[in-house]
Amino acid sequence: MNNANFEKYVDLVFEANKNFNLTGFKTKEAIYQNLVIEILTLFKGYEKFFIDKTVADLGSGNGSPGIILKLLFQKIKKLVLIDSKHKKISFLNKLTKQLNLEKTVAICERIEVHKNHYDVICSRGLSTIIKVNDLAFSLLNSKGIIFHIKQSLDQYIEFEKSNQKNQFNLLFIKHFTSQNKKLILIALQKND
């Protein structure tokens, strides 16, 4: 893990955020805390889920969590950053180039064409757990894992009440509190 790369990531997001909305965080300190430190803390100790895996970050936007995970777990086989906004994809391509991230691509296309393609999917702010699971189910390989980053368990409780609970097994839930902000990492594994 190279701290200089995380600092470079923060600088690039900060500068690009002046021109178009990548994040609501307006200072380098806030970007570092919320887009880097939180991801490093939430995923600490979970490298085994990423080694030699094909990973997708749905709704990647500013590159967190995907790029942060690629910097943290350099043995990710391939990282695909997916977003529906061309401007954000252009930024992500520039970001991956400036950070010298190999086997990392940013795409702006219908994600449905990627059936059974990913071992791991990450989602932070894209949508509800149920909606992201709907998208992710056909994208994941057999026994693939999806990581949801949320601020409460409300959406997980709704997921538990839904028919989707038969499609995914809960691997774990990890809680993290930082600066009066609560985050939850929910890991679900596809049932086949």
Swiss-Prot record:
May I have one GO cellular component term? cytosol
Keywords on record: Cytoplasm, Methyltransferase, rRNA processing, S-adenosyl-L-methionine, Transferase
Key word NADP present: no
EC no. given is: 2.1.1.-
InterPro entries per UniProt: rRNA_ssu_MeTfrase_G, SAM-dependent_MTases_sf
Which residues of the sequence carry a binding annotation for S-adenosyl-L-methionine? 59, 111-112, 124
The subcellular localization recorded is: Cytoplasm
In terms of HAMAP family, this protein maps to: 16SrRNA_methyltr_G (MF_00074)
Its recorded name reads: Ribosomal RNA small subunit methyltransferase G
Q: Which gene encodes it?
A: rsmG
